[in-house]
Amino acid sequence: MTGFTVRGFNHTGFVVTDLDRAIGFFRDLLGFEVLSRAPRDPALMGRMTRLPQPELEIVHLQGPGHRIELLHYATNGIRNADQPRVYDDGAAHVALDVDDMDAAVAASAAHGLELVGEVVTIDAGPNRGRKVVYLQSAYGLTIELIGPPPAG
């Protein structure tokens, strides 16, 4: 026994370089609702992150069954030239079930996301038979789209 119980997921967070574009992706393309957008206290966030006096703005968005947190550090001064690749240690993504893979890929491209590889059909595991693809944005998001289960 661990002495505590996980009661559910609270959110998935992404650090992004362009908060407005990331909001547009989740709100305008995916239909998520913006719950809050506000700067955070630099002293408090510095204690949490060990980054001295970070200038940070956080947005929370609600989607179907899950909340997304977008974080923008305006003054960290240590931006990575490249975001993690989908196969790098520590890389993260959120996977979204979509009802039309072709339409989702096209709409995502219109919002500046690019295919990492190609759309493939999974051959094993819980998503067997479903089409999947990774997408990345220039502002720090990696999204996996998962198409509907095969008919029958």
Task: Describe these PLM feature segments.
Residues 1-5, 14, 96-152:
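Vicinal oxygen chelate
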Residues 15-65, 103, 110, 123-128, ...:
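Core segments of cupin and vicinal oxygen chelate
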Residues 7-11, 56, 89-93, 130:
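Short, solvent-exposed beta-strand edge segments and adjacent coil->beta transition regions
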Residues 9, 16, 26, 61, ...:
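Short, structured motif recognition centered on aromatic/hydrophobic residues
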Residues 80:
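Zn2+-dependent peptidoglycan hydrolase active-site motif and core
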Residues 83-87, 94-96:
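Short secondary-structure subsegments characteristic of cysteine-rich extracellular domains
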